[in-house]
């Protein structure tokens, strides 16, 4: 599990 909080990730 990865936490992409505060960054821009397009899924």
From Swiss-Prot:
Keywords: Amidation, Amphibian defense peptide, Hypotensive agent, Pyrrolidone carboxylic acid, Secreted, Sulfation. The modification Sulfotyrosine is found at residue 4. GO terms for biological process: defense response; regulation of blood pressure. Isoform 4.2Y4 differs from isoform 4.2 in not being sulfated. It comes from the Eukaryota. The modification Phenylalanine amide is found at residue 11. It is found in: Secreted. GO terms for cellular component: extracellular region. The modification Pyrrolidone carboxylic acid is found at residue 1. Expressed by the skin dorsal glands. Hypotensive neuropeptide. Belongs to the gastrin/cholecystokinin family. This is Caerulein-4.2/4.2Y4.
